[in-house]
A protein has these predicted regions:
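Hydrophobic alpha-helical interaction segments
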Residues: 56-138
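Short gly/ser-rich loop at a beta-strand->alpha-helix junction or flexible surface loop bordering the NTP-binding
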Residues: 2-81
Length: 138
């Protein structure tokens, strides 16, 4: 069983996507995962692909001006299989990002260089548990 995922294009790139998400005023919940969610902890390289979880992909995409595409997407928006992706989120650059453990899981199963990014983030997590684990986890 997999999440239902839709491809979109943010023509100005991932930084523009982050800016748009930070400025959007929707009450719709979302959480960014993958390369973007790894940035506050262990940046591997500039993000080229973003994964966003939300309950209503079409509405979120319209609110932030994304273009639906069949190929060449730089933004994937997924309806999560479980609401766990919305738990233990944090804020980075005024956007909601998933927990590092969720970002690792998504990166390790992602396309392109995502698995290498996942390995890099996982190594960082092992060396810096006190930084990313919340007090409730201890």
């Amino acid at each position: 069983d997999t999440s239902t995922t839709y491809g979109f294009l943010e023509p100005r790139g991932i930084d523009a996507l982050v800016t748009k998400l930070a400025k959007q005023s929707s009450t719709q919940r979302y959480a960014v995962s993958g390369s973007v969610a790894a940035q506050p902890y262990a940046p591997y390289a500039d993000a080229r692909l973003s994964l966003i979880y939300t309950d209503d992909p079409a509405t979120l995409a319209a609110e932030i001006g994304l273009r639906p595409v069949a190929a060449g997407a730089n933004v994937l928006i997924a309806v999560p299989r479980s609401p766990v992706v919305f738990e233990r989120t944090s804020t980075w650059r005024d956007i909601t990002v998933v927990a590092p453990s969720q970002a690792v899981a998504d990166l390790l199963s992602g396309p392109g260089r995502n698995p290498a990014e996942g390995d890099y983030l996982l190594s960082w997590m092992k060396e810096n548990e006190d930084v990313w684990r919340r007090q409730l986890d201890r």
